[in-house]
Design a protein with these regions (language model features):
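Post-DEXD/H (motif II) to motif III coupling segment of the RecA-like Helicase ATP-binding lobe
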Residues: 1-26
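A short beta-strand-to-loop transition that corresponds to the Sensor-1 phosphate-sensing loop
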Residues: 2-6, 61-64, 142-146, 196
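Conserved segment of the helicase C-terminal RecA-like domain
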Residues: 7, 156, 160-210
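Short glycine-/polar-rich loops that comprise or flank the Walker A/P-loop
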Residues: 16-17, 55, 110-111, 153-156, ...
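Conserved C-terminal RecA-like helicase domain
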Residues: 18, 35-46, 51-139, 163-174, ...
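SF2 helicase motor core recognition
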Residues: 125-130, 140-155, 179-188
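Long, hydrophobic alpha-helical segments
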Residues: 201-253
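C-terminal accessory/interaction regions of large nucleic acid-associated machines
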Residues: 230-476
């Protein structure tokens, strides 16, 4: 199954996969479209709607910043009662204690309102969905996570923003958002409320670049295709990458998460350096600040890392260097998190932005993209050093400790499964598993043990329960 609202795939895809494409237009619920007026006050119009409608409501916003702006506005213009639900209050206190008491995610929870976006820790995001499913949360503000793997729906869906990544919503995306309204066997009529006219219906066409490559197919994918799968129009482009002598083709293929053109640009820059300058890149395991700065500059300018770093709240190579250095110096995530939140607030950054900058950095850059780029740079630098007859470098140990955030290697995987580091620490200290255990051993131990005693209060106990269900435990 490809997904909803898809009407066509390329003929060549059907031919290569030897498949048939069937369209199914059956809808499990009816959806009614309602138009809201932006003027004179869009937020007041939304507040009036929330006063009037019954049932749970999802509100689509284009970004985490938009959710922050909207919840702040809503709580300013409406006196929303504090929730009486014990689990929500505990969740609000937990987020307040571990992040900041003015973080609007925590503030919203105190009023029985949920926020869900990609910067939230996985456990908190999973909690928001479960609390919404159980009816504890009546209003849930979402970003594109609404349509990217979040399996929930509501009687009412409000499209507050008609954009995604600063572009107008296309028909396919709008249809997916609309599809979150209503649920079979719960509410057969769904309501979708919009401030702007929906996008015009178009023929939703899904291409498959790995099977039907075109001009927009990334070079990193093209060089990994067999020769017969590369169309003649792209043959020259692919041949130029495969026949160049600057870097081994296997190196380009190995680092498929980075475009080969960027890898080659980095190599060209390094080759052009004088020996004295090139030798500055020869470091291993325990870098000083200038070592991190040197490699960060190259990642930012030549290796194409700037775009990914900006998505993780890094505004420059210098900022990226400073944050990596602070993390490396502290060697303690909770301490780093507290210090960086406080230091940003002292420079007049809002508590909301400060918290979410740190979350974005830890999840999107430090534990994911930075190790990927540093490992690629390690191979490029070593190749150039070898060409010049110089001693090699070894950035990989440093990349690994940053990726795991100075924690047992299993912690990052457990975090993605929905178990916060704070609870993993309790389990480790309680000898439920050992820091050197493989992930398989850890997961098996956690699946087959009764762990609720490690949770402080309802919230943590339910987080542990959600996590255990997610890894296949049978919870009575």
């Amino acid at each position: 199954m490809l997904g909803p609202s898809i009407k066509s795939i390329p003929a060549i895809v059907k031919e290569k996969l030897n498949c048939k494409f069937l369209i199914e237009d059956f809808q499990t619920v009816a959806v009614e479209l309602h138009f809201l007026k932006k003027k004179p006050n869009k937020d007041e119009a939304l507040a009036n709607l929330l006063d009037e409608i019954d049932g749970q409501t999802m509100i689509y916003c284009q970004s985490p910043a938009s959710t922050r702006k909207l919840i702040k506005s809503y709580l300013d213009i409406r006196e929303v009662e504090m929730t009486q639900d014990g689990e929500l209050l505990e969740a609000a206190k937990w987020t307040s204690d571990n992040y900041h008491d003015e973080w609007l995610v925590s503030v919203a929870l105190r009023h029985g309102i949920g926020i869900h976006h990609g910067r939230l820790p996985r456990a908190l995001g999973r909690f928001m969905i479960r609390a919404f499913e159980e009816g504890k949360i009546k209003i849930l503000l979402c970003t594109s996570t609404l349509i990217e793997g979040v399996n929930t729906s509501a009687k009412n869906v409000v499209v507050y923003d008609s954009k995604l990544n600063r572009r107008s919503l296309d028909f396919f995306t709008f249809s997916n958002i609309k599809g979150r309204s209503g649920r079979m066997f719960r509410h057969f009529m769904g309501n979708i409320f919009v401030f702007d006219a929906p996008p015009e219906e178009e023929l939703p066409f899904v291409d498959m670049p790995a099977i039907n490559p075109g001009e927009n197919t990334p070079s990193s994918l093209l060089i990994n295709l067999s020769e017969m799968d590369v169309p003649s129009t792209l043959r020259e482009k692919v041949d130029s990458l495969l026949r160049q002598k600057l870097l081994p083709v296997e190196l380009l293929k190995q680092h498929s998460g980075i475009e080969p053109e960027y890898l080659l640009d980095a190599a060209k820059t390094l080759i052009s350096l004088e020996v004295r300058e090139l030798e500055r890149y020869v470091w291993a395991s325990r870098p000083v600040y200038d070592d991190i700065k040197l490699t960060s500059d190259l990642i930012w300018t030549q290796l194409g890392g700037a775009a990914a770093a900006r998505q993780s709240s890094m505004r420059s190579a210098s900022m990226m260097t400073f944050w990596i250095w602070r993390l490396y110096s502290s060697r303690n995530v909770p301490q780093f998190r507290r210090e960086m939140i406080i230091s940003q607030i002292e420079r007049n950054t809002s508590p909301d932005e400060a918290v979410e900058n740190v979350l974005a950095f830890l999840r999107g850059w430090a534990s994911f993209n930075y190790p990927k780029y540093l490992a690629a740079l390690n191979d490029v630098v070593n190749h150039v050093l070898q060409l010049k007859g110089l001693s090699g470098c070894n950035y990989l140990p440093f990349a690994m400790i940053i990726e795991h955030l100075f924690q047992p290697s299993s912690f990052s995987a457990l975090e993605e499964y929905g178990l916060p580091t704070e609870i993993s620490e309790k389990l480790l200290n309680g000898r439920v598993f050992n820091k050197d255990d493989s992930l398989d051993v850890v997961v098996n131990n956690l699946r087959n043990r009764k762990l609720d005693r490690f949770g402080d209060g309802i919230f943590e106990k339910r987080v542990i329960e959600d996590f255990q269900r997610g890894i296949g435990a049978k919870i009575s």
